[in-house]
C-alpha cells in the first residue's frame, strides 16, 4: 500500500514517490543484511492497471491509460534505480522483480483480432519487459502504447532521455525476473465505447 502522504502527492505519478521508494529500499538493504533475495516490486502492472484503468485500487481512476502507462514507466524507473543502488552497495545477495505476465492470443486469424492481441500484449507485457529486460523501449512497443493512449483521447506519456541509461544499466545487472502466471487472454477487435 502506498502511504497516504505519498498518494496525496500523486503516488506513482510523482517523482517524490520514486525518491521515497528508493530511500526505503536503501534503508531495507542496510537494515536487513541477512536477506539474500530481494524483489523490487511485485506485479507492478497489476498495481498500475487497477489504479488507473479498472479503478479497483486507490486512487480509483477508470480508463486513464496515459496515467497507467506513466505509473508503469515510473515503476520501471524506480526498479532500475533500486537495482543499480543495490549493486553499487556491493550487497552479497540477488535482486530482481516479479511480473504478472499474461499470454495474449488473437481470438481469430483476422488482422483486427491479431492487432487487438498486439495492443493487449503491449499493455500487459511488452512495456514492462522492454524496460526491465532490454533496458529500453522498442519503437514497436511505444507505437502500440501511443495507439492505446490516443485511442482513449489522452496524451502520450513522458519518457526522458536521461532515464535510458538508468534502465540500461539495471537491465544488465538484474539477477532474476519472477513470473506470476494466472491465465491467458484471447482478444477480439472492438471499436466501441469502453465498458469498464
Each PLM stretch: what is its role?
Residues 1-196:
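Active-site region of glycoside hydrolase catalytic domains
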Amino acid at each position: 500500500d502506498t502511504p497516504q502522504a505519498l498518494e496525496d502527492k500523486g503516488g506513482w505519478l510523482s517523482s517524490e514517490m520514486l525518491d521515497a521508494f528508493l530511500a526505503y529500499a536503501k534503508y531495507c538493504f542496510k537494515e536487513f543484511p541477512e536477506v539474500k533475495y530481494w524483489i523490487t516490486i511485485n506485479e507492478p502492472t497489476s498495481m498500475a492497471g487497477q489504479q488507473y484503468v479498472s479503478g479497483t485500487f486507490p486512487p480509483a481512476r477508470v480508463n486513464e491509460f496515459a496515467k497507467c502507462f506513466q505509473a508503469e514507466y515510473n515503476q520501471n524507473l524506480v526498479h532500475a534505480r533500486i537495482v543499480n543502488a543495490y549493486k553499487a552497495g556491493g550487497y552479497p545477495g540477488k535482486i530482481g522483480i516479479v511480473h504478472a505476465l499474461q499470454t495474449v492470443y488473437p481470438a481469430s486469424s483476422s488482422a483486427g483480432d491479431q492487432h487487438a492481441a498486439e495492443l493487449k500484449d503491449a499493455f500487459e507485457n511488452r512495456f514492462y519487459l522492454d524496460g526491465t529486460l532490454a533496458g529500453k523501449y522498442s519503437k514497436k512497443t511505444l507505437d502500440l502504447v501511443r495507439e492505446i493512449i490516443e485511442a482513449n483521447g489522452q496524451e502520450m506519456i513522458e519518457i526522458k532521455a536521461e532515464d535510458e541509461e538508468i534502465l540500461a544499466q539495471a537491465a544488465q545487472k538484474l539477477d532474476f525476473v519472477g513470473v506470476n502466471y494466472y491465465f491467458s487472454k484471447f482478444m477480439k477487435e472492438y471499436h466501441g465505447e469502453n465498458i469498464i
